[in-house]
C-alpha cells in the first residue's frame, strides 16, 4: 500500500488560518488539553453528584452545605461555601486564564495580527450572536430577564475536551490550536463582561488599595521571584481588596495573571521554563482537578422537580433563550463569522481540515458551563427561580450541543487519524515530527 502524502506545514505561510503552530507550542497545547480533559471529567462527575444529591430525599443536606457560612465578618468575608467557590476558587481559574491570555498575545497564536484575526472574530461572533438570540427571546418579558443576556456567551473548554475524550476523536493540531485560541479569546471577553456589566456598588478606595499589593506582586514576578510565601499573601490581599471594591473578585485573578512575565530571560542560571510556565504547571492541576469541580458541585445543584419541573423551567423565556443561544447562536456565531472573515480576506484553510470540521468545533463551542453558571448567579442571584431555570437551560443546551458536535466530529474520525499519523511521523529520527520540521 502506498504511503499517504505528507501534509505540508503551513504555519509560516501567510494567508493560512487554522494552521499548525511550532512544535514547542504544539507540545504545550497538548499538555494543557490533557490536563483540561481530566478536569472536564471531574467537572462532569461533580455536576452529576450535585444534581443527584439536590434531587434526592437528602436534598436539604446539599443546600444546607452550600449555604454554610465561614470567614471573617469585619472584613466582609463571611461567605457561604457556594460563594467561596465562585468568588475564591474561580479566581485561580481566572488567574490561569490571565496567564494564557498574556502568553497568546506575547508569544502565541494571537501575537501576529494575520493569524489572530480569524479566531478573535470567531470568538466575538460566538458572543454577539448568542447574546442577540437570548435578547430576542426575552424582549416581551419583564426587564429583569434581560440581565441574563451574557449567560450563553461563554464556552467551557474543560467540558468540551471531556466530550472529545468520550467520543475518542483525534483532532488535528490545527483544530486543537484553534479550539484553545478560541477559548482564550472567549475567556477574555467573559472577563470584560463580568468586570463591566456585573460589578455593583463600586468602592473606589478599595479598588485603589488593591493596586498596592498588585504593584508589589508585579514587581516581584518581574524580578522572577517565585517564593510562594511572598507572592501568595500579596495575591490574597489583591483578591480581598478587589472583592471589597464591588468588582467581582475573579477579576483579581486575571489582573495577577497579566502581571506575570511569560518569556524567560535566558540568563545564566535561569530555569529552563519561564515564571508563567512554572506557575501554570503548579496551579493548573489544582484549578482543573479541584477548584472548578468544587465550583460546579456547589453551583450545578438544582431541584428539578421531575419531568414536570423540568418542563416548567424550560418554558421560562430565560431558559428558552439560553438553550437556543447555546445550540444555534454559538454555532452560527463561530462558524458564520469564521466563514465570512475567511471568504472576505486572503485567508484560506490549512490543508489538514475542512469546513465541516470547523462546524463541528462551532457546535462544540455551545458547551457553556463554568462561566455561564457564574454569570447566571451574577445576573439573577443564587437560589432565585430564574437562576435555577438558567442552570437547567445551561445543562440542556450544553448537552444538545455536545451531542450534535459528537455526531459531526465522530464522523470525521477516520480522516483525523490519518492526519494524526502524519503529525507523529519522524522519519529522520530527530525527535521532531517531520511535518513540524518543515518551514
Swiss-Prot record:
A GO MF label: sodium:proton antiporter activity
GO biological process annotation, one example: regulation of pH
Reaction catalysis annotation: Na(+)(in) + 2 H(+)(out) = Na(+)(out) + 2 H(+)(in)
GO terms for cellular component: plasma membrane
Coiled coil (UniProt feature): none
Biased amino acid composition, Acidic residues: 421-431
Family, per entry: Belongs to the NhaA Na(+)/H(+) (TC 2.A.33) antiporter family.
Descriptive protein name: Na(+)/H(+) antiporter NhaA
Gene name of this polypeptide: nhaA
Amino acid at each position: 500500500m502506498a504511503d499517504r502524502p505528507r501534509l505540508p506545514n503551513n504555519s509560516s505561510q501567510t494567508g493560512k488560518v487554522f494552521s499548525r503552530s511550532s512544535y514547542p507550542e504544539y507540545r504545550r497545547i497538548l499538555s494543557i488539553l490533557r490536563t483540561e480533559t481530566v478536569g472536564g471529567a471531574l467537572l462532569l462527575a461533580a455536576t452529576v453528584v450535585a444534581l443527584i444529591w439536590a434531587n434526592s430525599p437528602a436534598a436539604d443536606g446539599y443546600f444546607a452545605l452550600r449555604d454554610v457560612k465561614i470567614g471573617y465578618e469585619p472584613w466582609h468575608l463571611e461567605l457561604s461555601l457556594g460563594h467561596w467557590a465562585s468568588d475564591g476558587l474561580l479566581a485561580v481559574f481566572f488567574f490561569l486564564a490571565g496567564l494564557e491570555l498574556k502568553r497568546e498575545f506575547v508569544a502565541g497564536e494571537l501575537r501576529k495580527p494575520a493569524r489572530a484575526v480569524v479566531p478573535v472574530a470567531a470568538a466575538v461572533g460566538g458572543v454577539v450572536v448568542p447574546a442577540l438570540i437570548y435578547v430576542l427571546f426575552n424582549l416581551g418579558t419583564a426587564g429583569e430577564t434581560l440581565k441574563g443576556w451574557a449567560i450563553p456567551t461563554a464556552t467551557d473548554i474543560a467540558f468540551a475536551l471531556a466530550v472529545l475524550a468520550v467520543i475518542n476523536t483525534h483532532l488535528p493540531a490545527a483544530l486543537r490550536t484553534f479550539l484553545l485560541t478560541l477559548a482564550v479569546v472567549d475567556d477574555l471577553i467573559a472577563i470584560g463582561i463580568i468586570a463591566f456589566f456585573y460589578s455593583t456598588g463600586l468602592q473606589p478606595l478599595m479598588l485603589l488599595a488593591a493596586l498596592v499589593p498588585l504593584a508589589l506582586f508585579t514587581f516581584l514576578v518581574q524580578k522572577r521571584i517565585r517564593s510562594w510565601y511572598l507572592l501568595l499573601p500579596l495575591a490574597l490581599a489583591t483578591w480581598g481588596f478587589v472583592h471589597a471594591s464591588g468588582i467581582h473578585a475573579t477579576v483579581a485573578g486575571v489582573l495577577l495573571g497579566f502581571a506575570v512575565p511569560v518569556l524567560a530571560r535566558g540568563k545564566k542560571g535561569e530555569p529552563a521554563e519561564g515564571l508563567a510556565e512554572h506557575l501554570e504547571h503548579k496551579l493548573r492541576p489544582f484549578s482543573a482537578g479541584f477548584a472548578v469541580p468544587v465550583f460546579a458541585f456547589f453551583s450545578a445543584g438544582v431541584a428539578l422537580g421531575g419531568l414536570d419541573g423540568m418542563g416548567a423551567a424550560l418554558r421560562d423565556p430565560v431558559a428558552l433563550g439560553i438553550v437556543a443561544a447555546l445550540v444555534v447562536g454559538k454555532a452560527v456565531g463561530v462558524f458564520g463569522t469564521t466563514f465570512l472573515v475567511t471568504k472576505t480576506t486572503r485567508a484560506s484553510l490549512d490543508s489538514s481540515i475542512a469546513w465541516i470540521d470547523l462546524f463541528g468545533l462551532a457546535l462544540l463551542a455551545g458547551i457553556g458551563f463554568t462561566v455561564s453558571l457564574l454569570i447566571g448567579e451574577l445576573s439573577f442571584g443564587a437560589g432565585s427561580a430564574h437562576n435555577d431555570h438558567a442552570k437547567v437551560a445551561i445543562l440542556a443546551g450544553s448537552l444538545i450541543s455536545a451531542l450534535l458536535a459528537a455526531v459531526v466530529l465522530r464522523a470525521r474520525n477516520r480522516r483525523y487519524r490519518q492526519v494524526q499519523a502524519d503529525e507523529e511521523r519522524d522519519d529522520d529520527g530527530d525527535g521532531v515530527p517531520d511535518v513540524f520540521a518543515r518551514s
